[in-house]
């Protein structure tokens, strides 16, 4: 069975490991070793966990980890690295309609219904769980007029040439730093979690203070202009960086997938 296969894999190279480590001059007490698959080791860990629990040192939280939908279990970073390889992946560019201008920018035209943040992602399946956008605080962003459509777009100035080959196709309206856009609000892409734009609704679900709700602009230094638009979409339940940005915001995570990573009834169009 599955457990026997795993056990055989662990024990397959035990003797070779012992010879190699000894030749390296590293001392290991092989005769009194332990294996994490052994019940006595597992029981020791449970004893430690119970002791910590009794002392009130354990709390429940959420953390982003690699996950296998086939096995329906989390993976260690070591397991993930074993199959690592560089591949070409599909990316999508998405526009988010701005509904409220940030306090730092005096431009009510941002709320004209034709002005959009342009974001980029290589994980489009996380877009139904989008709760925010993120800019780099010191990156230069431009608001441009797309002359063909008449719409206005905001993204990193360094990425203009990637989206517009001909400078005659657009007009730069102004330049601002990413930090100036903090707090700008936008229209949710999907209706599934639109209620989280209301801070009171966020507080009711998360049990934490929430002053502004979801679907707004954040800042983080990990955002770059090497790829995409210089604006990243944030789905806090699906990325470690995303989760850290939202931590303390009072906005609850949304996880509309089951153990096999299939959409649940919350995402009604794709269930």
Predicted regions, residues:
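Short acidic beta-strand-loop surface patches of small beta-rich interaction domains
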Residues: 261-270
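A glycine-biased structural micro-motif
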Residues: 182-183, 269-271
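N-terminal Rossmann-like or analogous alpha/beta NTP/dinucleotide-binding catalytic cores
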Residues: 1-50, 54, 245-247
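Gly-rich Lys/Arg/Thr-decorated short loops/hinges at beta-loop-alpha junctions or inter-strand turns
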Residues: 1, 225-227, 265
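NTP-handling and nucleic-acid-processing catalytic cores
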Residues: 27, 39-260
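Alpha-helix capping and helix-coil boundary motifs
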Residues: 1-5, 177, 271
